[in-house]
Amino acid sequence: MRNEIEILARKELESANKKFSLFHSSHEGFAVLLEEAEELAEESNEIEKIMNSWWLYIRRDEDIDVQKKRVDRIRSRAVNAAMEAIQVIAMCDKFKMSL
């Protein structure tokens, strides 16, 4: 799986480099990397919120169809988090290329 992630990160870096120039300073690189890291954290936080609220309802025997909808939301957020993590990796690589 690690190899596949590295391939996706390389593709993301290539795409980003076609759209945007290399970073002009450490400050710029930091800001871009911070934004991507914050977006990753936001997705993770949303998963945690869903899990916490789910636990409250699961103890009350929540309907399985409602639980499946919660799992769909968790899955969607996890996919988003994976995409953000790949962007973090790509921006780390871009930083090293830039400076």
Roles of regions detected by a PLM:
Residues 1-99:
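Flexible "arm" and connector segments at domain edges
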